[in-house]
């Protein structure tokens, strides 16, 4: 099922940022080009595996935008974008996030107490962003029904599971200076 995702991961360029081997991929970076067949495949896999008995889909700017829009369109479930910009709307919640290579503020709007939500994102590495998002959703009184992330790298998934939440990832990878190695994926035809 994830033929395009597997192939594009295997051929993803690697750049060095300090001591960090950063992979460049259409799902996580939007470059060089996001092909519709790749996005369609990823969203179809999310539809097949995610708990869609929710009121809202929650995703994180920037690369969560195409995922959220496509999944919302396919399921008719509204989506919320956690933004990098403050809007100062009533009830806005600041989300302080720290990742393996950045930190900053994000802002959550549009969540009501009792909303059942599905969180989706492009990558989980350290889990820093996801922890911050979970904390903000809990503060807003949302019920987190499921978390689905396209690409798993590092121990971030484990750190979220230690908080009591399951995280489904479509593909698990490791990255070194030689490239991306696929360690597993949600479908049976991974390798």
Swiss-Prot record:
Organism domain of life: Archaea
Keyword Cytoplasm listed: yes
Gene Ontology CC, one term: cytoplasm
Gene Ontology biological-process annotations: IMP salvage; purine ribonucleoside salvage
Reaction catalyzed: IMP + diphosphate = hypoxanthine + 5-phospho-alpha-D-ribose 1-diphosphate; GMP + diphosphate = guanine + 5-phospho-alpha-D-ribose 1-diphosphate
Family matches, as Gene3D superfamilies: 3.40.50.2020
Single GO MF descriptor: hypoxanthine phosphoribosyltransferase activity
Entry-linked HAMAP family: Hypx_phosphoribosyltr
Function: Catalyzes a salvage reaction resulting in the formation of IMP that is energically less costly than de novo synthesis.
Entry similarity comment: Belongs to the purine/pyrimidine phosphoribosyltransferase family. Archaeal HPRT subfamily.
Name the UniProt record assigns to this protein: Hypoxanthine/guanine phosphoribosyltransferase
